[in-house]
Amino acid sequence: PIAGSMVLAAILLKLGGYGIIRMMQILPTTKTDMFLPFIVLALWGAILANLTCLQQTDLKSLIAYSSISHMGLVVAAIIIQTPWGLTGAMTLMIAHGFTSSALFCLANTTYERTHTRILILTRGFHNILPMTTTWWLLANLMNIATPPTLNFTSELLIMSTLFNWCPTTIILLGLSMLITASYSLHMFLSTQMGPTPLNNQTEPTHSREHLLMALHLIPLMMISMKPELII
């Protein structure tokens, strides 16, 4: 069910990050070197999840693995135990909650019209539903963390934190972000471009779907430009 996927990705997946933030308060704050294996594992796990996204043919599986990769960055930022790292992790959890929920919503919009989640069978939607293609483009750009979205702010904070702690981590971070951009563009091109494989009548999009997407994406830009809205 699409509602379950949206709640799972937006809220329940972030409970792990919240639990780590709570537990880190009772651990020593100065000895971050002892957490080095966990930080490396978190970044390496993010890269492996991103590589798994590249070979997915199921749309919902691709979005789910994308959520896992972003949580790797959150864990790495929390473990370093700096104010910037904590701020970046919390901001990324909020931003990715909106983004992944929006992507699952778009995947359901596509599924309701094609009755399949296979990428190669959902292509050509830019000819049929151009407004939905616009929402897909915006959601994927936010997943890549382009400015002026909250995703960009959070990943910038996390990159600064990790680079200050250990400059070598920028290699793993850069590789992770490169793969994220690759599978996000691959997802967009696979679902929207190319010839349409459908021969039947496609139902047009409804106002509620456009409203739902607007309520997902507008807060990401508003919070990034005016963070005092939630602080």
UniProtKB/Swiss-Prot annotation:
Membrane topology value: Multi-pass membrane protein
> Where does this protein chiefly localize?
mitochondrion
Q: Which reaction does it catalyse?
A: a ubiquinone + NADH + 5 H(+)(in) = a ubiquinol + NAD(+) + 4 H(+)(out)
Q: Where are the transmembrane segments?
A: 1-21, 34-54, 61-80, 84-106, 128-148, 169-189
Where in or outside the cell it occurs: the entry states: Mitochondrion membrane
Q: Which UniProt keywords apply?
A: Electron transport, Membrane, Mitochondrion, NAD, Respiratory chain, Translocase, Transmembrane, Transmembrane helix, Transport, Ubiquinone
Which enzyme class? translocase
EC number(s) per entry: 7.1.1.2
Q: Look up the domain of life of the source.
A: Eukaryota
Protein role: Core subunit of the mitochondrial membrane respiratory chain NADH dehydrogenase (Complex I) that is believed to belong to the minimal assembly required for catalysis. Complex I functions in the transfer of electrons from NADH to the respiratory chain. The immediate electron acceptor for the enzyme is believed to be ubiquinone.
Q: Which family does it belong to?
A: Belongs to the complex I subunit 4 family.
What name has this protein been given in UniProt? NADH-ubiquinone oxidoreductase chain 4
The gene it comes from is MT-ND4
